[in-house]
Amino acid sequence: MKTSLLFYRTSKNANKEASVLSYELLEKAGYLFKTSKGIYSYTPLFQRVILKMTEIIREELNAIGGQEVCLPLLQSAELWQKTGRWEAFLSEKLLYVLKDRENKEMCLAPTHEEVVSEFVSQWLTGRKQLPVHLYQIGTKFRDEIRPRFGLMRAKEFLMEDSYTFSDSPEQMEEQYAKLRLAYQRIFDRLNLKYVIVTADGGKIGKGKSEEFHVLCSLGEDTICVSGSYGANIEAAQAIPPSYTYSSELLPMKEVATPNVRTIEDLETFFNTPRQQIIKTLVVKVHKKGSEQFFAICIRGDRQVNLTKVSSFLQADDCELASDEEIIKHLHVEKGFIGPLHCPVPCYADETTRPMTNFICANNQKDIHCRYVNWERDIPLPIFGDFLLAESGDLCPQNNEAPYEIFQGVEVAHIFNLGTRYTECFSVGFQDENGEKQLCWMGTYGIGVGRTLAACIEQLADSKGIVWPLAVAPFSITILYNGGDTEGEAVASQFYQSLNTAGFEPLLDDRNERLGFKLKDSDLLGIPYKLIIGKSFQKTGMLEIESRSGEKYNISPENLLDWCSKNLPCHTRKIPPIRE
């Protein structure tokens, strides 16, 4: 490809609206064009990157028996209502909803579990067809409340989604392991630093679930890592630093605490460490279209994990109750809520189980109780794991070694769904006894745009994008000083040679200074530069420089040999461009 024919432009100035590096560089380098809030057009440059990324995905999924399909973007509400997810997604206002001419409700697909389950239920003829792995690479839609970070959180985005159907839990686990390994190979080919972490299934399902996170400072997700084990902070089990409590139980006392509302206030007022105080939060739980309120107790030095609370209570969602809701349902102001005489169901985190002689509110304004003890003063609550993990907590899955905390961008998510969806759509087969058995389902997805944005966040430098060689739009840029007719002729000769061999060169044939072209090549993130400059004129040797700064002096006759050892060959993968 010649730069003069490439429909693109670069910019010297960053977009003031770009809040993250990946978005800034994609626009600055001519890869992305914003058409509306959270909606982007991919330029010819970026489409080449997309094609290479999706080719890697196809190669790895086809290698494990995946079969590509194309499922509809427009889906009926009726399908979603079968699984109960229509109401759940509507409550979060994430669906793009519309009606057809027959006044039937439809949505633009955020995911395809319902559609693929309906499809397989109609086409599965017997057990011999199992396991089956179907996948697609296509557009998804989410009406994000706050679309931001460019491709990280867009309203329209490109995803690969896979669906497996198996005849047993064991076969489902085998498929899960295959997809997990295939996803690892995909990210390994991008040379990214990533971790696989235990995760919460969210609204898709409550079965086994893991996320792939690319590590970078921008990451929206907090990742807890201990040795080879990792977990999203939403799902991380943790053992906090221990605290020694007295075995001598003291008589409970009521203490007037005017305007003493926070843990900090209590710590100062009683001159007592936070580990001796119980903090109680009120949560509002959404479950099957109704709202319920619960009190959650935790040790005063720790925070409640709302995702764990939601999972424990088998809720669709949960959030902290507002000040107004607390007064309405508990008849007391925030800051004076506690497990004593609590008017709503009360649960307690495991951190509170060993506590003795603790301080807590008793649901009266300006009153707290001291030297409170379980069983004697308060019936034992139902205990659960509601703890938000922190750096330094011990990891129960790794011989109680401490956690380190990192930021990550979620680029893929894999789930075992069991029979949740197959039961709704009667996806099954007849066993040897003639009885109907349900299929066991898995669902898996890679955010294509998010992965490429994460590449930039992790690998970019002060000069611009640094694409992994596997997905770079061009492998090597051929550069010469504009106006140098001899350099232009030599560059054109090498361009023809490399192009014929399938090494995807980009010939910068603009009438610009060599320094300008070098900066543009670095901004674009092209892995290598072939420079036809003063060195070639003096010595006849070609200078090749990698994006990371390594330099190679190559004789012209050895150029193809060097390229064959260092550059990928794409003779048939990317469609040819008219020259």
Curated annotation (Swiss-Prot):
GTP-binding listed as a keyword: no
Acyltransferase is among the record's keywords: no
Gene behind the chain: proS
Primary localization: cytoplasm
Any Pfam family matching the protein: tRNA-synt_2b
InterPro entries reported for this sequence: aa-tRNA-synt_IIb, aa-tRNA-synth_II, aa-tRNA-synth_II/BPL/LPL, Anticodon-bd, Anticodon-bd_dom_sf, Pro-tRNA-ligase_IIa, Pro-tRNA-synth_IIa_bac-type, Pro-tRNA-Synthase_IIa_type1
Entry's localization field: Cytoplasm
Enzyme Commission number(s) from the entry: 6.1.1.15
Function: Catalyzes the attachment of proline to tRNA(Pro) in a two-step reaction: proline is first activated by ATP to form Pro-AMP and then transferred to the acceptor end of tRNA(Pro). As ProRS can inadvertently accommodate and process non-cognate amino acids such as alanine and cysteine, to avoid such errors it has two additional distinct editing activities against alanine. One activity is designated as 'pretransfer' editing and involves the tRNA(Pro)-independent hydrolysis of activated Ala-AMP.
Domain comment (free text): Consists of three domains: the N-terminal catalytic domain, the editing domain and the C-terminal anticodon-binding domain.
GO molecular function, one term: proline-tRNA ligase activity
Family assignment from sequence similarity: Belongs to the class-II aminoacyl-tRNA synthetase family. ProS type 1 subfamily.
GO biological process, alphabetically ordered: prolyl-tRNA aminoacylation
UniProt GO cellular component terms: cytosol
Enzyme class, broadest EC rank: ligase
Annotated catalysed reactions: tRNA(Pro) + L-proline + ATP = L-prolyl-tRNA(Pro) + AMP + diphosphate
Species classification: Bacteria, Pseudomonadati, Chlamydiota, Chlamydiia, Chlamydiales
Domain of life: Bacteria
Listed CDD domains: ProRS-INS, ProRS_anticodon_short, ProRS_core_prok
Keywords: Aminoacyl-tRNA synthetase, ATP-binding, Cytoplasm, Ligase, Nucleotide-binding, Protein biosynthesis
Description of how the protein assembles with itself and partners: Homodimer.
PANTHER family in the cross-refs: MITOCHONDRIAL RIBOSOME PROTEIN L39/PROLYL-TRNA LIGASE FAMILY MEMBER, PROLINE--TRNA LIGASE
Protein name: Proline--tRNA ligase
